[in-house]
């Protein structure tokens, strides 16, 4: 049975525990499809106060995470999870996307090291396999990014989602990487806004064409960078401009 094993290394374990225990991720752990461990980096620090940061050499604002506690935490995690990839969450890293999330899910073992303060001592990089970012912005720490990695990868593990087709139909899924089409549920009318007639028609061919058209339109309008990379057949180019009565 495929499953995802992760160990999150953090200075603030409680920030991660609540999220991992709820909803789909909590159920995945109960089912044995996700094994999530949270390690307090301070457990590998020395001294009465278990200090994990210090002033940067050369001066400057803020503090830097010391190498000893984090590297020792990584080494201990590697011993628990042989073959795991060590991923440092950092704005300097490669951008997390659906393809990378799938690689993580398929590999099955991750050690996620969460940075804090002004950054991590560069010597820690000798113990890291890759750095990953969730966007071109800076957070207070790497915990939110680590949770994004776990969530994105775990939902791709077979059995985690109730409907196996859900992950395949979502935004960025598949080879093309289109944004997902709009979704509707009951009631059929809300404050004068009606569900598109085609979705109520029961005509599955029209519904699939409508979803394809809306996914193409959403990608063109909201992510022109993705749309520009697509090699669309003539039928898709016509579909984008088609009205509901032409589906």
Swiss-Prot record:
It is found in: Cytoplasm. Signal peptide: none annotated. S-adenosyl-L-methionine binds at residues 115, 134-139. It comes from the Bacteria. Its main location: cytoplasm. InterPro entries: Alpha/beta_knot_MTases (IPR029028), tRNA_m1G_MeTrfase_C_sf (IPR023148), tRNA_m1G_MeTrfase_TrmD (IPR002649), tRNA_m1G_MTases_N (IPR029026), tRNA_MeTrfase_TRMD/TRM10 (IPR016009). Its EC number is 2.1.1.228. One of its GO terms (molecular function) is tRNA (guanine(37)-N1)-methyltransferase activity. It catalyses: guanosine(37) in tRNA + S-adenosyl-L-methionine = N(1)-methylguanosine(37) in tRNA + S-adenosyl-L-homocysteine + H(+). GO terms for cellular component: cytosol. GO terms for biological process: tRNA N1-guanine methylation. Keywords: Cytoplasm, Methyltransferase, S-adenosyl-L-methionine, Transferase, tRNA processing. Belongs to the RNA methyltransferase TrmD family. NCBIfam families: PRK00026.1, trmD. Homodimer. Specifically methylates guanosine-37 in various tRNAs. This is tRNA (guanine-N(1)-)-methyltransferase. It comes from Anaeromyxobacter dehalogenans (strain 2CP-1 / ATCC BAA-258).
């Amino acid at each position: 049975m495929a499953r995802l094993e992760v160990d999150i290394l953090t200075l603030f374990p409680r920030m991660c525990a609540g999220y991992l225990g709820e909803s789909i991720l909590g159920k995945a752990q109960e089912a044995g499809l996700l094994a999530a461990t949270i390690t307090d980096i301070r457990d590998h620090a020395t001294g009465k106060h278990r200090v994990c940061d210090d002033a940067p050499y050369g001066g400057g604002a803020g503090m830097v995470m010391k190498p000893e506690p984090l590297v020792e935490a990584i080494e201990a995690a590697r011993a628990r999870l042989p073959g795991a990839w060590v991923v440092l969450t950092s704005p300097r890293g490669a951008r997390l996307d659906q393809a990378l999330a799938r690689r993580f899910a398929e590999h099955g073992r991750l050690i996620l090291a969460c940075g804090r303060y002004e950054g991590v001592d560069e010597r820690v990089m000798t113990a890291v396999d890759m750095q990953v970012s969730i966007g071109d912005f800076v957070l207070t720490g790497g915990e939110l990014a680590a949770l994004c990695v776990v969530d994105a990868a775990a939902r791709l593990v077979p059995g985690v989602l109730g409907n196996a087709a859900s992950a395949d139909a979502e935004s960025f899924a598949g080879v093309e990487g289109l944004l997902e089409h709009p979704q509707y549920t009951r009631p059929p009318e809300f404050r004068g806004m009606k569900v598109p007639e085609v979705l109520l028609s029961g005509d599955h061919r029209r519904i699939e064409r409508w979803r394809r058209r809306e996914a193409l339109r959403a990608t063109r309008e909201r992510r022109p960078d993705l749309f520009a990379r697509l090699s669309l057949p003539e039928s898709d180019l016509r579909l984008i401009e088609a009205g509901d009565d032409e589906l």
